[in-house]
Amino acid sequence: MNEKAKQFIKKRTSVFIALLVVFCFFLLISAFADGFNFWSPWSADFNSRTLKVEQASGVTSVISTEINENFKAVRFSFSIIIILIVGVIGSLMIWELFTNILKNKPKLSLSLTLLNAGIIIFGMIGTFVVVYFYKWNATVNGIWTLSFTLSVVLLWIIYIACMSKTRIKFSLQLSYSLGAIACFIASIGTIYFSVIRGWTTIFLLMSLAVSVDTFSFLFGKRFGKNPLIKISPSKTWEGAFFGIISTIVVVALLCVLYSIPFFVAKPTFNQTNGIALNTPQNYDSHNLITNIFLIAFISGGSSFYIYWWVSTLALIFTGSVFAIGGDLFFSYIKRLISIKDFSKVLGKHGGVLDRFDSSSFLISFFFVYHLIAGTISNQRLLMEPNTYFSAITSIQS
């Protein structure tokens, strides 16, 4: 190996270590911001909450609530740090995208970047003010969902309107704006999963993205013969297939490890007349499956455990497909504008968007899934912490 190759590997390794340290710091802050799940530092005794059982319309709900009200201000403070970190990263992704698309309009690219940053940062700070210090009820949830939807539509219109001043074809305007929208939704989703659903949730999602990227590359390089798509000949059907299968196995194993009630006290219920015996809490001690896959909203009772795993594996598969789709989509955009990397912000690793291309589609998918599933089920609101449901018709006394 010559000196140039050694320097290249050294620089890539240095950047990788730096990114890993930043991600670990991000997880730490996420843990400090999260007082909702059993792994939170603010629940070190594992008994600083109560699980209340409610029953209505034949459905038994087990609701986890935080007892110590003093932690709200602390959690809110750390949530702001999460918002700022994600806001900066998301804005860098938008800036890299539009800087390459609108090459002769740097001021316009900067304006679009600042617009995104403003909506993400101030919008989510306002959201968490309500979450922590007021009541997140159905009315607020409806207003937030409508506001989020209108923001996405408005941003999409603004993106296309700005690009219409150039000679970019309308079909390409739609593609470019879709990439920007994915970055925006992924930023909101990352904040949501990190703070409301906990650091274990965002860790599992990022593990899914890294796993499918890594295994697809390794298997594709070794066994790949059939290109997945012409714009990216290095990605093959063989690599994608083995990448998805390997990811399903890896993430399923992580789910199994998370389901082990390690350092988690037996849930206590503030009812003396009995408890719902067949609740998701019995299978999901760390709230992980409920947080990410929302299977508890779909099925309950005696068939819940089997249905839980079948649905979970199906969603891991779907998420893996979206991750590969994000990688291919942004490769397509780079091919259209004739660039290798979106920027050199991360040196030999390229730009921020080059590192989070697959994650942007993956997290966007899961966030929209949460938004839709919560609305359709009409059981747990989007910003409500860890509420469990089982379709049980009676509570045993």
Curated annotation (Swiss-Prot):
Enzyme class label: transferase
A GO BP annotation: CDP-diacylglycerol biosynthetic process
GO cellular component: plasma membrane
GO molecular function: phosphatidate cytidylyltransferase activity
Location within or outside the cell: Cell membrane
UniProt note: phenotype after gene disruption: Not essential, it can be deleted.
Identification of the protein by name: Putative phosphatidate cytidylyltransferase
Gene coding for it: cdsA
